[in-house]
């Protein structure tokens, strides 16, 4: 769980969401991208995982057996490779980490937002992506994250405007961004 905090911009990027779970006496930690997950299925999985009627033991002993018995609504797999975990979270599936286990459960409950994504009329391109932004920030950040699957991609949300208090997102890739320029932008 500590490694996840080091690899993902948890608490910094608004579209990265987490949830603490308690599976009996065992702590779990879920990570996903807001807008990429089917929330109804996730809620059912969370409910089943934490249901005291299903908890025979207060401690999870075998992660494979636990996964097979408790997760029936989604495709689930195990991995102990952090590159695989990061790649999966950033491409749609979410991850469930359970304290005391080296393996993570990858939950494929992805649901990409859809809308007729048209090429902007005023900005024709000859090469590259032809996606156009829409009205909702979450949808737009999902469009970007589908193309750039870097764990260093961060979206910081800020309010601008004295009266309108409009939400804007500052998007950048840690390690590539000019920190001085980023600080200047944050203060504007």
Q: What does each model-identified segment do?
A:
Residues 1-188:
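Membrane-embedded alpha-helical signal segments
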